[in-house]
A protein has these predicted regions:
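Short alpha-helical segments enriched in small residues
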Residues: 1-158
């Protein structure tokens, strides 16, 4: 399982990870916490910013950025990762996630249900990723977890 390998690699490198989640509502953080002898050693925690007011008032994401691009966008997710580094000062890696897990939100034909934006901050760089996932909400979250774990593994293995 990729998630387990990712957690073991984080632990071996003594790296700490934190999450700023919207669409995934803390699911990514919970999945990274479940492995014995890794969760407590690698995981700092998470902020779930499902409501745009949390993004604005806690993460200090400008309202204008949200209005211009929507709360579920590459630009807002990138800003969330940047702000996550300020919230989680001991984090080596911050993973931010927005998207459209279920119908509604800012869904369009160009950005349909199942769209996710991920930004991963590590070593003063931020990698932005876009996924379009199929399946039920839970299937999408499980796919997203594995994809994020693989991206983190790729980033820390360079």
């Amino acid at each position: 399982m990729i998630l387990k390998r990712c957690c073991e690699k984080l632990e071996n490198l003594s790296l700490k990870i934190a999450f700023i989640e919207s669409a995934s509502s803390g699911y990514l953080c919970s999945q990274f916490s479940i492995y014995k002898n890794t969760g407590a050693d690698i995981l700092l925690g998470a902020l779930v910013s499902y409501d745009p007011n949390i993004k604005q008032h806690i993460l200090h994401i400008p309202r204008s950025l949200i209005l211009q691009h929507s709360a579920e966008s590459k630009e807002v997710t990138h800003a969330m990762a940047q702000q996550g580094l300020h919230l989680f000062t001991d984090a080596d890696i911050v993973v931010a996630c927005t998207g459209l897990l279920k119908p509604g939100g800012s869904a369009t034909t160009e950005k349909p249900e199942g769209t996710f934006f991920i930004s991963i901050a590590y070593l003063k760089k931020i990698k932005d990723i876009h996924y379009l996932l199929n399946g039920t909400a839970l299937e999408r979250l499980d796919q997203l977890t594995e994809l994020v774990a693989q991206e983190v593994l790729n980033i820390i293995s360079v």
